Amino acid sequence: MKKKLIFGVIVVLLLSSCGFKIVNNKELYNYSIIDVKSSGDSKIGYLLKNNLQVKNEIQNKKIKLDIKIIKNKSIKEKNIKNQITKYEISLNLKVEYNLDFSNESGTFSISKTGSYDVEEKYSQTKNNENNLIAELSNNLVEEIKINLSEITNDL
């Protein structure tokens, strides 16, 4: 019994100071996006540009992006009367990056899918579509930032 207690105390003491530190996300975004070009859907391109172009003058890691946007809108569900009840939107991005600080370049792809309901009024349906596009765009921006931080920090 005493051996188990002593062993437990030793294990706790050794593991409690193992040096693990929670990574602060702000420290990972140590780059500056200086130029964003987009082709494809202009509305989504506008949303992506506005959310990505945060210039941090202090950082010396400057990145240029070229984003190709492919938007697919398809019917997801129909009811018994063959009326459309849900649409599905799929956003596919091909992001080409150019790192000015190391003359390195490459590409990565990101894809997000979501669906929205068809309402009785067209304006409500259009509003649902716009809200979904904004939400998917914000999710894509976060994924782009994560991928860029992994690339710039060699994670």
Provide a role label for each language-model segment.
Residues 14-17:
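C-terminal motif of bacterial Sec signal peptides marking the signal peptidase cleavage site
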Residues 19-21:
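Bacterial signal peptide processing site
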Residues 1-4:
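Positively charged n-region of N-terminal signal peptides that target proteins for export
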Residues 75, 154-155:
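Extended, charged amphipathic interaction segments
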Residues 28-49:
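Post-signal peptide N-terminal segment of mature Sec-exported envelope proteins
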Residues 9-11:
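Hydrophobic helical h-region of N-terminal Sec-dependent signal peptides
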Residues 127-152:
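Short, well-ordered alpha-helical segments
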Residues 49-50, 55, 60, 66-131, ...:
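Surface-exposed short loop/turn segments
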